[in-house]
Amino acid sequence: MKGGSIEAGEVSKDASPRKGVARGLSIMDFILRIIAAVATLGSALAMGTTNETLPFATQFIKFRAEFDDLPSLVFFVMANAVVCGYLVLSLMISVFHILRSTPVKSRILLVALDTVMLSLVTASASAATSIVYIAHNGNTGANWFAICQQYNNFCERISGSLIGSYIAVALFIILIMLSLVAISRN
């Protein structure tokens, strides 16, 4: 009898920490999704509202730099907006995982969708980074001149908007690993 009661106590002790760890992973997943959504929203807003007009202009020509002059920066804004929307929608699934720690199929779906969104945000950040690099340094081989000496505020804002996007890339990698750990524990 004592042996049976000890075994039953051990089983209940093993089951309780598993649920606690799964719940902790789910709460961490929820928090990281909120942070990533704020980062991508901030990046999209910072880039999407960036423009600068030079103080000197002729009667017919205004020297103006806007993000939508460059397709790579438009892609950056759109991709960050899509990823932010996905992150906000995925918060519902994350709350479901907090309430119920055992759903494996929805975690597998999140891993797949998180991987797609990781690819999208990485591609957009890389494309925007190349444009920001050329804006700062130019390319003498192609006769592209650096514009950041003239459009200082524009360059600071587009450079700063990359930070949130790269934070989202790092958070997506962590989110995918957390989901895979949660799947392997079930």
From Swiss-Prot:
Signal sequence residues: none
Extracellular membrane side: 48-72, 129-162
Ranges in the topological domain labelled Cytoplasmic: 1-26, 94-107, 184-186
Residues passing through the membrane, by range: 27-47, 73-93, 108-128, 163-183
Membrane topology category: Multi-pass membrane protein
Glycosylation sites recorded in the entry for this protein: N51
Entry keywords, A to Z: Cell membrane, Cell wall biogenesis/degradation, Glycoprotein, Membrane, Transmembrane, Transmembrane helix
GO CC, alphabetical: plasma membrane
Keyword Glycoprotein: yes
Protein's GO biological process: cell wall modification; cell-cell junction assembly
Location(s) in or outside the cell: Cell membrane
Predominant place of localization: membrane
Classification via InterPro entries: CASP/CASPL, CASP_dom, CASPL
Family stated for the protein in its record: Belongs to the Casparian strip membrane proteins (CASP) family.
Subunit-level organization: Homodimer and heterodimers.
Chain's role: Regulates membrane-cell wall junctions and localized cell wall deposition. Required for establishment of the Casparian strip membrane domain (CSD) and the subsequent formation of Casparian strips, a cell wall modification of the root endodermis that determines an apoplastic barrier between the intraorganismal apoplasm and the extraorganismal apoplasm and prevents lateral diffusion.
This protein's name: CASP-like protein 7
Source species: Glycine max
Lineage: Eukaryota, Viridiplantae, Streptophyta, Embryophyta, Tracheophyta
